[in-house]
Amino acid sequence: MDSDMSGGMVKVMVPASTANLGPGFDVLGVALNLYTEISMEFIKDGLEIFVEGEGVEDIENDQNNLIYKSAEVIFKKIGVFNKGLRIKIKNEIPLGRGLGSSAAAIVGGLLAANELTGRVLKREEILNLAALIEGHADNVTAALNGGLNVSIFDKNKVYYARKALEDDIDFLAFVPQEMVRTEIARKVLPEKVDFNDAVFNTGRTAFLVSVLIEKKYELLKIATQDMLHQKYRAKLVPFMEECFEKALLAGAYAAFLSGAGPTIMAISSPENSERVLKEVGKVYEERGLSYRAYRLKCENNGAQVLKTPSFV
């Protein structure tokens, strides 16, 4: 397949996400209203990548760029060759902080490339490819679908259930200056876990989903408890437990590591959010640590196509 696909530019917008939510390791994900916006179009030859916003110094502008590499998966799959490509990225999602920046890049690259080549693949196929590239399904499923997602990745296929969340809770993200790559955060995890710890997390993961759906937010504190990963990752975020404690004392419903960290995420009622932001912020300030705090909502729309080429 070649030419005849110069009908213009495609633009997509993909949300950030928080995964695990405590006990739901590699299973739970919630989309959040921070975004990566990607414009993509074919050009005569070469590769041009322009980056604005978060990570401008860290996002590659060559063939190692994750958005480009994801787009290439689509092009090779459907047989598009000998095309130059221009990609423009406007990014709001902090990199390497546990907020799904790589998932947004992967989903965005796949979705944009699919639109650019005539929408050959269904969104379900895009999701399966995204999970294959990412290696797990929690963030990419949330990024593509929006809302709260429970997902499993089995034999290269994603199975999921999704539920939109209302805006009566805030997701408060405390993002430190230092990043922790997911591969580093996974290396500190044990190869085997205690059977009782597995049972502990299984029960709380199921309970957490029910609590969010039924809006029994006062039960989130116990529902978000974890025994499988956070205690091992504490060495990478040494003030983690203190942040959790301060958040709960300030009135948050729950606090946990966002994904692999190092971002600390708290869930709060809008009425308590400012107090939680202030009290947890003190943990960073007292240590002289730079951080940013975001007051976010669940993004229920998921990845969106903002502009479609004329031939689609």
Swiss-Prot record:
Binding annotation for ATP: 94-104
Keyword Ribosomal protein: no
GO biological process, one term: threonine biosynthetic process
Keywords carried by this UniProt record: Amino-acid biosynthesis, ATP-binding, Cytoplasm, Kinase, Nucleotide-binding, Threonine biosynthesis, Transferase
SUPFAM superfamilies, sorted: GHMP Kinase, C-terminal domain (SSF55060), Ribosomal protein S5 domain 2-like (SSF54211)
The EC number(s) this enzyme carries: 2.7.1.39
Highest taxon above the source species: Bacteria
PROSITE patterns: GHMP_KINASES_ATP
Protein name: Homoserine kinase
Broad enzyme group: transferase
Gene that encodes it: thrB
Main location: cytoplasm
Organism expressing this protein natively: Caldanaerobacter subterraneus subsp. tengcongensis (strain DSM 15242 / JCM 11007 / NBRC 100824 / MB4) (Thermoanaerobacter tengcongensis)
Protein family: Belongs to the GHMP kinase family. Homoserine kinase subfamily.
Role summary: Catalyzes the ATP-dependent phosphorylation of L-homoserine to L-homoserine phosphate.
PANTHER family per record: HOMOSERINE KINASE, HOMOSERINE/4-DIPHOSPHOCYTIDYL-2-C-METHYL-D-ERYTHRITOL KINASE
Any one Gene Ontology molecular-function term assigned to this protein's record: ATP binding
Compartment(s) where it occurs, according to its Swiss-Prot or TrEMBL record: Cytoplasm
Disulphide bond pairs: none
Coiled-coil stretches: none
